[in-house]
């Protein structure tokens, strides 16, 4: 049997960021971008991506620390070695995420969806989503000639977000 090692994720998906090293024994701070922060540890293996370089890592141990986590990487027990990963992106292969039910979606799936208001006016294309304390925000690249800035639309289901059509890749919003 041949052992094949994947050195780069298939369908890369950003799920977190590496912070600075912690202590002298090779621990490092981790910032999770997952909806439930602790679920970042359900999606393995991780790949660190920094300065166009991929590094597949294995987690030896992790702990909750303040509002984030600290991680000990297998085979690294030196602060100077682990510090090379500071500010790296934490990437997984998209296929490691759980399968979704019909009409469910992950945030990254709706990037590039077209956005229309309920009057069928085309507003633009989704370029990002951000989490805020009160509600998530849909960032739309504005296609209206009047304003050139991005449109920020609160992601409030049924009130503002009327429909997310995953088959036709568009979002219908209550927005002027």
From Swiss-Prot:
Quoted from the entry, the domain comment is: The PRC barrel domain binds ribosomal protein uS19.
Q: Name one GO molecular function term.
A: ribosome binding
Keyword rRNA processing among UniProt keywords: yes
Q: What keywords appear on the UniProt entry?
A: Chaperone, Cytoplasm, Ribosome biogenesis, rRNA processing
- Which protein family is it in? Belongs to the RimM family.
Question: Which named protein is this?
Answer: Ribosome maturation factor RimM
**Gene3D superfamilies assigned:** PRC-barrel domain, RimM
Q: Which Pfam families match?
A: PRC, RimM
Gene source species: Buchnera aphidicola subsp. Acyrthosiphon pisum (strain APS) (Acyrthosiphon pisum symbiotic bacterium)
